[in-house]
């Protein structure tokens, strides 16, 4: 059997289970992209490296295998740093493949010359440059580093002379003989002695306020965490992208009384979440100043970070599923009859009050639509188990977090750890590519829409049927009622016709001003997605909003 270097590399990726690649082609990687397609790998050509990098990044999260990004070198790689950073911060597996100058042109000012290996190696888990002699080793190492330990980013540099190398690799069958073709993350269990100490602490404080905080790092461990919550009747609070790991519909979910739940928590089990800005660094005044945080994580660097409580010494390192199972078994062994009292009465009352307030807001009618009215209309139209909802934008995303509960994991994606704007269409493309059988609904603010609107054409061309809802308040945070004179930095053009942008790019266009129009258009868009694999853009005109000072609401204001 003979094959070229490029063919061998593409075949190797396919044998490792790589089925989808996002990117933008150019010199010298066009031939590599063609070879990937010839070997059964789906290539999704995007319109901008930033959006492509976000798509590949999210694919690594939503599909449970490394996302793969193929781009040109130099400026193409620089444009893709957004998604690389996104995967690093979110701890998602990503393989970046970029073209580079021929070896003979290095240090001569070659075409798009950039020493990409040196640029990236201090920050990524692995970087390597392909030669005809090291294809198997570099590919295996890159993919293995992506998934082992804390998931992250690997980089493979593909010089132009590698792609142009046409000499057959005689008898190159090493993929089946020397290196394993199935890459599985290794996991380890927790320290049994620490599990015993955690159980003793819980039972010693069983009359105190106990809370489980669930992060997206525990997304693979839904079964084990549901068992813990339900067996011992423990209240829980999911972080935004952890919604659905335990059903939001559970009576033990305290999300609707988040602020109060944090303030009264005494013992806090943190499962796969970081004590960062999303959890207010684990400090007062958001939290009870006496709270004891016990962190469970597969990443040892997370343990003890921002944790100044006595629980830092009890942090559990290991696979979260194995650790939670060990906790359940040890709790049962030490006290087989114990069951926590559940959600406190004061929290139940606050949940009821806030849910009533939310429903009242959704039913209050004004001269123009607002976020609450729109979300209250869309919620019953969304089939939870067959829908992935991506939300992006400041108010758009914040209000969506309380308006769209879910009972299934990996059904809610948003700006995440980095609070990144620009992820919306890339994430939506990844979700549809990974799960074509599901509805993918993207709800964006009008500012967020502008970051990657051209990717609508990608969705149309690749038949990645999306339902895109633009919450158009003509501004960032809020619009301006009076557009005369100098406009503030937050202002955008009033009532832009984003629906017509979608139409120009091949999507169905809907322009919405009323609840009845919204209901009809959304249902029509979903049907077009399911039956004809068509993308739709629904431009919803909403009120500009309050003209008030902009503050970091997540950090400074109570949440529902």
UniProtKB/Swiss-Prot annotation:
Keywords: Cytoplasm, Lyase, Magnesium, Metal-binding, Peroxisome, Thiamine pyrophosphate. One of its GO terms (cellular component) is cytoplasm. One of its GO terms (molecular function) is 2-hydroxyacyl-CoA lyase activity. It is found in: Cytoplasm; Peroxisome matrix. PROSITE patterns: TPP_ENZYMES. InterPro entries: DHS-like_NAD/FAD-binding_dom, HACL1-like, THDP-binding, Thiamin_PyroP_enz_cen_dom, Thiamin_PyroP_enz_TPP-bd_dom, TPP-bd_CS, TPP_enzyme_TPP-bd. Pfam families: TPP_enzyme_C, TPP_enzyme_M, TPP_enzyme_N. SUPFAM superfamilies: DHS-like NAD/FAD-binding domain (SSF52467), Thiamin diphosphate-binding fold (THDP-binding) (SSF52518). Its EC number is 4.1.2.63. Mg(2+) binds at residues 446, 473. The keyword Mitochondrion does not apply. Its cofactor is Mg(2+); thiamine diphosphate. A motif (Peroxisomal target signal 1 (PTS1)) lies at residues 558-560. Thiamine diphosphate binds at residue 49. Belongs to the TPP enzyme family. PANTHER family: 2-HYDROXYACYL-COA LYASE, 2-HYDROXYACYL-COA LYASE 1. Peroxisomal targeting signal 1 (PTS1) is a tripeptide located at the C-terminus of more than 95% of all peroxisomal matrix proteins. The prototypical PTS1 is the terminal tripeptide SKL (serine-lysine-leucine) but the consensus of PTS1 is defined as [S/A/H/C/E/P/Q/V] [K/R/H/Q] [L/F]. However, this description of the PTS1 consensus must probably be expanded beyond the terminal tripeptide. This is 2-hydroxyacyl-CoA lyase. It comes from Saccharomyces cerevisiae (strain ATCC 204508 / S288c) (Baker's yeast).
């Amino acid at each position: 059997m003979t094959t070229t270097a490029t063919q061998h590399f593409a075949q190797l990726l396919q044998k490792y289970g790589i089925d989808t690649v996002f990117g933008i082609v150019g010199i010298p990687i066009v031939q590599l992209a063609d070879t990937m397609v010839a070997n059964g790998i789906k290539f999704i050509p995007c319109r901008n490296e930033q959006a492509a990098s976000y798509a590949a990044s999210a694919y690594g999260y939503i599909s449970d295998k490394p996302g793969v990004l193929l781009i040109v070198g130099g400026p193409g790689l620089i444009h893709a740093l957004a998604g690389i950073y996104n995967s690093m911060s979110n701890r998602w597996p990503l393989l970046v493949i970029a073209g580079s100058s021929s070896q003979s042109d290095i240090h001569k000012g070659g075409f798009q010359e950039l020493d990409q290996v040196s640029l990236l190696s201090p920050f990524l888990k692995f970087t390597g440059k392909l030669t005809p002699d090291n294809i198997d080793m570099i590919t295996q190492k890159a993919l293995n580093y992506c998934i082992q330990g804390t998931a992250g980013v690997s980089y493979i540099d593909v010089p132009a002379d590698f792609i142009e190398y046409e000499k057959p690799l005689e008898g190159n069958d090493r993929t089946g003989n020397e290196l394993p073709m199935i890459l599985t993350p290794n996991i380890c269990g927790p320290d049994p002695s620490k599990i015993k100490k955690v159980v003793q602490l819980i039972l010693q404080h069983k009359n105190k306020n106990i809370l489980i905080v669930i992060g997206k790092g525990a997304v693979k461990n839904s079964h084990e965490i549901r068992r813990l919550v339900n067996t011992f009747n423990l209240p829980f609070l999911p972080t935004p992208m952890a919604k659905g790991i335990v059903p939001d519909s559970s009576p033990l979910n305290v999300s609707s009384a988040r602020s109060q739940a944090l303030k009264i928590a005494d013992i806090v089990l943190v499962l796969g979440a970081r004590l960062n800005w999303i959890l207010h660094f684990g400090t007062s005044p958001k939290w009870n100043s006496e709270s004891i945080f016990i962190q469970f994580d597969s990443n040892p660097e997370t343990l003890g970070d921002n944790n100044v409580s006595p629980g830092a010494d009890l942090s559990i390192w290991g696979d979260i599923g194995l650790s939670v199972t060990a906790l359940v078994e040890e709790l049962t062994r030490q006290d087989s009859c114990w069951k926590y009292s559940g959600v406190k009465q004061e929290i139940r009352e606050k949940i009821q009050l806030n849910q009533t307030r939310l429903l009242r807001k959704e039913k209050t009618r004004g001269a123009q639509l607002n976020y609450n009215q729109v979300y209250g209309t869309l919620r019953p139209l969304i089939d939870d188990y067959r829908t992935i909802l991506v939300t992006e934008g400041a108010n758009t995303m914040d209000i969506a977090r309380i308006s769209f509960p879910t009972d299934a994991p990996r059904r809610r994606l948003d700006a995440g750890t980095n609070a990144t704007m620009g992820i919306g269409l890339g994430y939506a493309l990844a979700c549809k590519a990974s799960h074509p059988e599901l509805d993918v609904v993207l709800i964006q603010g009008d500012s967020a829409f502008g970051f990657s609107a051209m990717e609508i054409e990608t969705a149309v061309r690749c038949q990645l049927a999306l339902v895109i809802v633009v919450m158009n308040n003509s501004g960032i945070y809020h619009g301006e009622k009076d557009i005369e004179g100098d406009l503030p930095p937050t202002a955008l053009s009033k009532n832009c016709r984003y629906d017509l942008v979608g139409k120009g790019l091949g999507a169905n266009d809907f322009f919405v001003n009323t609840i009845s129009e919204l209901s009809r258009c959304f249902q029509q868009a979903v049907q077009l997605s399911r039956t004809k694999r068509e993308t739709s853009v629904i431009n919803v005109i909403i009120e500009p909003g309050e003209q008030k000072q902009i503050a970091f609401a997540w950090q400074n204001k109570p949440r529902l």
